[in-house]
Amino acid sequence: MFKYAIIGGTALKSMKSIETKHIENEYGLCEYNVLNEDTIFVPRHGMNYYVPPIFINYRANIKAMKDLGVEYAYAINSVGSLREEVEPLTIVMATDFLDFTKKRDYTFFTGLDKGVKFIAMDEPYSLEMNRLFEEKYDGKIMTGVLVTTEGPKFETKIENKFYKSIGGDVVGMTGSPEVILANELGIKYASLNVVGNYGTGVTDKHVEITNEQEDIALKAAYVVLDIYKAGLNFNDGAKFL
């Protein structure tokens, strides 16, 4: 059984692992790497191939983590900035989200034998996990609101203008429904969003820093491992859903 998880994309596949395993549940197959005796890495897009964000089996992944005993999960995402002041290579720790996905599976509780559950979303991301990461990370970092779109297309200028106007700070394609499903199963969840560029229409500046973005994501993952090794020393009174 494992207590901790890191969820991420292709940038994290180079993390040193003990072995690769898989687990199957009623929602499908989940592949994962064992990083140490307490921690696993779950590659959203698959281990040896690439599944687009719209087709990721989020329920299979989250249910697998729950079945494996996971209590804490840091997700690391690649995103674009909706604001000129949110510069590339910044990590934005999500404190809230806007979900503009359309055709994904958003709940485990589908009625009948699965029952129905209405989950509170007043604190979808663990503020204590954010705090611990901010204490240990030495790069550009801030908090903000994560917008998730369906993809696979990128957002239009007017879409990004709208997302910014309603409070969005960064935009990506993998944040939802992952955060919702983690909350449903009681997994304490944080989202670290690595800004790779500006969204369409945000600025005239052209920024292309794919390699640096991957380096930042990998650096963040190793910071998370250090947090896990320290045993997640939360303050008394920390609030979790």
Spans of features found by a protein language model:
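Metabolite-binding pocket within alpha/beta catalytic cores that recognizes anionic/polar moieties
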Residues: 1-119
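Non-catalytic positions within long, well-ordered alpha-helices that form the structural scaffold/packing
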Residues: 66-69, 164, 183
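Short acidic/polar active-site loop segments enriched in Thr and Asp
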Residues: 71-72, 169, 188
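Zn-dependent metallopeptidase/amidohydrolase metal-coordination segment
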Residues: 173-209
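His/Asp/Glu-rich mid-to-C-terminal helical/loop segments that flank catalytic regions of hydrolases
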Residues: 200-241
